[in-house]
Design a protein with these regions (language model features):
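Glycine-rich phosphate-binding loops of nucleotide-dependent enzymes
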Residues: 2-502
């Protein structure tokens, strides 16, 4: 029988930062051989409690940590590692130019490990870890050559090779396809069967419900409670996380009209990226594209924004054939594009919220003398912050000080500032908690109600189903199906994607 006795118990855990009480008297027990999900919005304290467990942060006085039967008042990174606590962060912290073997066995050859590098022993250790979770990875392959999913498995193998007894996974599925997610969840269950405690952090509530034995919900630095997963559903979990009830129903149906499409794509192709794409998008309409990672969705959007060139086909805007040679052409034709990667492509994280918001309209905010009209610019920024409901204490602060949800709203605001007729949103809710997801989709709905045409890439079928007038499915560079949410069930779209997945 699986051992479910406590591996670590945290009592009276508080953590204060200047002006913020990140943890407020949290009590948490993690058991051997269980999958324990930490759920909560961004900023609720999940990352802080993980850093207390891994010894990065020391809690305030009065804390007690019972780790494998021994009492501590705080942990250190080396002490946590000694007891088998391993954290797999979103960036995975792998060495891309090292082989799979070297990454898995690296802990033995860091300071405090063996002096001599024994290649044969390293390989045996790596193969044993790979075998233990039942996967197949080439031990000699450089990590930089691996898919994100395989890198995730390498990080798990490294934890196992370090004799992990508690593995904490922070947003492990954020960049994985559904098939890869299924593979990862199978590995998580293998770890559980081996008596290892797995702490699983994810914004995807369906995955949480699928894999968890117990769920601890955090809100505003406090533990709301710990619940058997069998006693919750995703709607109740969302309520516990946010204190709000979300009512989901498809958007009001848009009746067919003879209105000319705002955007029309005819037989658009780019070698090895997408083939024979035909789609239309009308004023006031939200159309989503779902599909697997690598299906060509982002590549198509990049061409619609002039960043890459199709080899054949046509793009029509407001009934006129256009040639989008670059993004400047796209902007002139009224197209805005919110990138899937806000950290490196969507925002300049070190620059201010103010600068990020006006960067797309900088040339329109000058006085006749050529100087920036700060009054006009500040009015624009203030209006956008208010209209998009962005929580900002001071627009002159760096955008990196914002939460993920508010940073994403700034990425949208900078394009709304251009008054586009067509707005492309590429995976706008990646890494965003449930309340902010709803807020971002409310922005999309509001923009559509104002007459904007919105094209979205969605990674989660429910999000597309409840926030689109039409849902398109893309596979291997081709659009293969179209759904009207008022004439189908959510499961029908999922079934098509699952068929595509096989």
């Amino acid at each position: 029988m699986t051992d479910t006795t406590a591996f670590i118990t945290l009592e009276n855990i508080s953590k204060q930062f200047p002006g913020v009480r990140a943890l407020d008297d949290v009590n948490l027990t993690l058991k051997k051989g269980e999958v324990h999900c930490l759920a909560g919005q961004n900023g609720c304290g999940k990352s802080t409690i993980i850093k207390v467990i891994s010894g990065v942060y020391q809690p305030e006085k009065g804390a007690q940590i019972l780790l494998d039967g021994k009492l501590f008042h705080h942990l250190t990174p080396s002490l946590s590692a000694h007891y088998g606590i391993q954290v797999i962060y979103q960036d995975l912290s792998l060495f891309p130019n090292f082989s799979v073997t070297e990454n898995i066995a690296v802990n033995r050859y860091l300071p405090g490990g063996d002096i001599w590098v024994r290649r044969g022993a390293m390989r045996q250790q790596a193969l044993a870890a790979v075998k233990r979770i039942g996967v197949t990875i080439d031990p000699d392959k450089k990590v930089e050559k691996l898919s994100i999913a395989d890198r995730q498995l390498v990080a798990i193998c490294r934890a196992i090779a370090a004799d992990a007894r508690l593995v904490i996974m922070d947003e492990p599925t954020a960049s994985l396809t559904r098939q890869e997610v299924n593979g990862l969840l199978r590995v998580v269950n293998e770890l559980k069967a081996a008596g290892i405690c797995v702490v699983f952090v994810s914004h995807r509530l369906d995955e949480v419900m699928e894999v968890a034995d117990r769920i601890s919900v955090m809100r505003d630095g406090k533990l709301v409670g710990t619940f058997p997963a069998s006693e919750l559903d995703s709607h109740e979990l969302a309520f516990l996380m946010t204190g709000q009830r979300f009512h989901y129903s498809p958007l009001p149906e848009k009746p067919p009209v003879e209105q000319e499409p705002m955007l029309e794509v005819r037989h658009l192709s780019r070698k090895d990226k997408y083939q024979d794409i035909n789609l239309s998008l009308r004023s006031g309409e939200i159309v989503s594209i779902v599909g697997l990672l690598g299906a060509g969705r982002t590549e198509l959007c990049l061409s619609l924004f002039g960043m890459t060139q199709p080899e054949s086909g046509e793009i029509w805007i407001n009934g006129k054939l256009v040639k989008l040679r670059n993004n400047h052409d796209a902007i002139k034709h009224g197209i805005g594009y919110v990138s899937e990667d806000r950290l490196t492509q969507g925002l300049i994280m070190e620059q201010s919220i103010y600068d990020n918001t006006i960067v797309t309209v900088f040339d329109k905010l000058h006085t006749r003398g050529g100087l920036l009209d700060h009054r006009k610019a500040r009015t624009l920024v203030d209006n956008l912050i208010r209209e998009l409901n962005i929580k900002v204490s001071d627009p002159l602060l760096p955008v990196k000080t914002l939460s993920g949800g508010n940073a994403q709203r700034i990425a949208i605001a900078k394009w709304v500032a251009t008054h586009p007729r067509i707005l492309i949103l590429d995976s706008p809710t990646v890494g965003v908690d449930i309340a902010n997801k709803e807020g971002i989709y409310q922005i999309a709905r509001s923009l559509a109600e104002q007459g904007m045409a919105v094209l979205m890439i969605c990674d989660e079928i429910p999000e597309a189903y409840y926030n689109s007038h039409r849902v398109l499915v893309m596979r291997r560079g081709r659009l293969v199906a179209e759904f009207n949410p008022h004439r189908c069930r959510e499961e029908e779209i999922a079934d098509v994607v699952e068929v595509i997945n096989e």
